[in-house]
Structures are given as C-alpha cells and as structure tokens.
C-alpha cells in the first residue's frame, strides 16, 4: 500500500473513532454525579448528564464549586457522557 493510502486509512480510522459514541462502560465516573448548582449565586445555563434518563439536561449553575458533571454546551455533555 502506498504512503498516501496509509495516510487515508489512518485518517478514516481517526474519523471513525471520533464519531463512535461512548458506550456506558467507557463513560467517565463523574457522569453519574447528580446536578450540583454549587453555593454561589450566578445564573449560568449549563448541562449535566442525567444517568437515570440517559440524556443531557439543562440546569442553573451558580458559578463555583459544584462537580465535574457540568458542561457549557449540550454537545459537550453528549460527547462526554451520553451513549
């Protein structure tokens, strides 16, 4: 196989890996944490993964503390936690 063919194959494999959904066994443990607004009083619309409903949901984050199950976009939440 030529070097160009190998590069194409490598590129396709990389793309396939990026587009393959994360399975529940590969999901980071913090995806199981409950939503946590934290003690601060900000009003940031963010997303968390709800493991009971197997989906990303919006919640209001106060802006400090909380936990790692906190994403700025629904896309980031789905990419990280949703199967």
Curated annotation (Swiss-Prot):
- Can you list the GO cellular component terms from the UniProt entry? extracellular space
Q: Which Pfam families match?
A: Kunitz_BPTI
The leader peptide range reads 1-24
- Main location group: secreted
Query: Which family, according to UniProt?
Result: Belongs to the venom Kunitz-type family.
The protein's job, in short, is: Serine protease inhibitor.
Q: What is the name attached to this protein's record?
A: Kunitz-type serine protease inhibitor nigrescinin-1
């Amino acid at each position: 196989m030529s070097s160009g063919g190998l590069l194409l194959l490598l590129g396709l494999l990389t793309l396939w890996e990026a587009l393959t959904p994360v399975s529940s066994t590969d999901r980071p443990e913090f995806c199981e944490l409950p939503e946590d607004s934290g003690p601060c009083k900000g009003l940031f619309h963010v997303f968390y993964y709800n493991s009971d409903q197997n989906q990303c949901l919006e919640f209001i984050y106060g802006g400090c503390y909380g936990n790692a199950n906190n994403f700025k976009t629904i896309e980031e939440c789905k990419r990280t936690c949703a199967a």
